[in-house]
């Protein structure tokens, strides 16, 4: 246990657009794990550093800036936390490289039972001034995100899987994994979307 405490820590909050990542992040940020960690937040950087999170140029610049920041943390073995849709292999690759570099990795993954739920939430978020994501992207990223969670969980020291399908209710912790193996189940009623993540043996 003492050895773990000397490792740099990587916290990844992942899930399809509109699943509720930011709510989980706001809770995790207060944890003692992250006392010296850098929070890499592209939305905040797009707004604060480049002017507007709904402007495509600002979003692109913020994404590039965040990628450099993550790579610097990896190179310097500096603890960090970031949110991701996890729909591309680049983030999977980053997590694998962090594992090879000796980081202690915690993955918090949250999804819903249908991408239509996610699309409606993103639409509501836009009405309140939040950033937009086109519906076709939300739908295509939904499955990719879940499949990539399954691919990367064996490289994570701790993985926490949440379902956030019910509006107005806190996301439900379904199960916890270590190195891709389920260590604790918190419910007997697993949503269908988790079948891609739950190990077959």
Which residues does each predicted region cover?
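Conserved lysine of the Walker
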Residues: 21
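Walker A (P-loop) phosphate-binding loop of P-loop NTPases
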Residues: 18
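Glycine-rich phosphate-binding loop used to anchor ATP phosphates in small-molecule kinases
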Residues: 61-110, 145, 160
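The Walker A (P-loop) glycine that initiates the GxxxxGKT/S ATP-binding motif of P-loop NTPases
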Residues: 12-15
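Phosphate-binding P-loop
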Residues: 1-7, 73-74
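Conserved substrate/cofactor phosphate-moiety recognition/catalytic segment
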Residues: 26-78
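A glycine- and Lys/Arg-enriched "phosphate-lid" helix/loop adjacent to the NTP-binding pocket
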Residues: 103-151
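NTP-dependent small-molecule kinase module
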Residues: 151-201
């Amino acid at each position: 246990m003492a050895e773990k405490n000397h490792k740099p820590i990587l916290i990844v909050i992942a899930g399809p657009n509109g699943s509720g990542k930011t709510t989980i992040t706001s809770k995790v940020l207060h944890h003692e794990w992250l006392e010296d960690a850098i929070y890499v937040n592209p939305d905040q950087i797009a707004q604060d550093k480049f002017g507007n999170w709904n402007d495509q140029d600002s979003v692109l610049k913020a994404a590039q800036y965040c990628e450099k920041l993550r790579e610097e943390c990896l190179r310097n073995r500096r603890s960090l936390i970031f949110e991701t849709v996890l729909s591309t292999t680049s983030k999977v690759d980053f997590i694998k490289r962090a594992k090879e570099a000796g980081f202690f990795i915690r993955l918090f993954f949250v999804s819903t039972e249908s991408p239509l739920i996610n699309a409606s939430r993103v639409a509501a978020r836009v009405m309140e001034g939040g950033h937009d994501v086109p519906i076709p992207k939300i739908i295509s990223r939904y499955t990719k995100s879940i499949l990539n969670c399954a691919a990367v969980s064996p490289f994570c020291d701790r993985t926490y899987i949440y379902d956030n399908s019910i509006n107005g209710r806190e996301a439900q912790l379904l199960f916890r994994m270590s190195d891709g193996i389920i260590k604790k189940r918190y419910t007997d009623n697993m949503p269908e979307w988790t079948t891609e993540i739950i190990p077959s043996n």
